[in-house]
């Protein structure tokens, strides 16, 4: 669709693409909305969520594909099947190129439009968290210096988001909780800092529990779901750490 649509039309088309599960096109509609918004004003909550859902679905299927291909690659290497290993490596490389492209697309949008135009604290945390998330996705499959850089960029974005969240958002706010969830996963999976991951998840969970009675009805479901995920991770990570200590 080469024609330029109005902002409302882009929102409608993004919803249509979402219903049809055509997430690459959903991304395109939301990118056009953001790039074409003059002046580059702040997105509404609905627009922001549509953008997030679009990218989350595209990156989600690619991350799942990468994990499957990587696991097949390990199996083929253990079987010493050189021909298959070579084919799988090439295929993994193709998936990684797509992952890099999607990540750089949203990161470019965040740096050029979304973060600079964010005025509300909630928006700032949302976009800085998103920036951290997509640098983290790069760190998942990059190696060497590229992985180190992606991890450093993740840390900077998450820390900036955390500073605003702790200052301005309630401990029960779903965006603050989501940040704590993803930041702790980053510590656990990318930095291999199990203790820091656990302490961060535990603190976020306990601070939210202490203020649970202040939760508004509209965000109750979102907040309690993320709290459940924080608790699930804590349980899993604690038992993993216990197993490692037992083995040692």
Swiss-Prot record:
Record keyword Phosphoprotein present: yes
PROSITE patterns for the chain: 1433_1 (PS00796), 1433_2 (PS00797)
Keywords: Cytoplasm, Nucleus, Phosphoprotein
Signal peptide span: none
UniProt xrefs under SUPFAM superfamilies: 14-3-3 protein
Phosphoserine modifications at: 70, 112, 193
One Gene Ontology CC term in the entry: nucleus
Biological processes per GO annotation: regulation of metabolic process; response to freezing
Subcellular location: Nucleus; Cytoplasm
Database matches in InterPro entries: 14-3-3, 14-3-3_CS, 14-3-3_dom_sf, 14-3-3_domain
Pfam families, A to Z: 14-3-3
Domain of life: Eukaryota
Phosphothreonine: residues carrying this PTM: 214
Task performed by this protein: Is associated with a DNA binding complex that binds to the G box, a well-characterized cis-acting DNA regulatory element found in plant genes. Involved in the regulation of nutrient metabolism. Negative regulator of freezing tolerance that modulates cold-responsive C-repeat-binding factors (CBF) DREB1A AND DREB1B proteins stability by facilitating their ubiquitin-mediated degradation; this processus is counteracted by B1L.
Similarity field: Belongs to the 14-3-3 family.
Protein name as catalogued: 14-3-3-like protein G-BOX factor 14 kappa
Source organism of the structure: Arabidopsis thaliana (Mouse-ear cress)
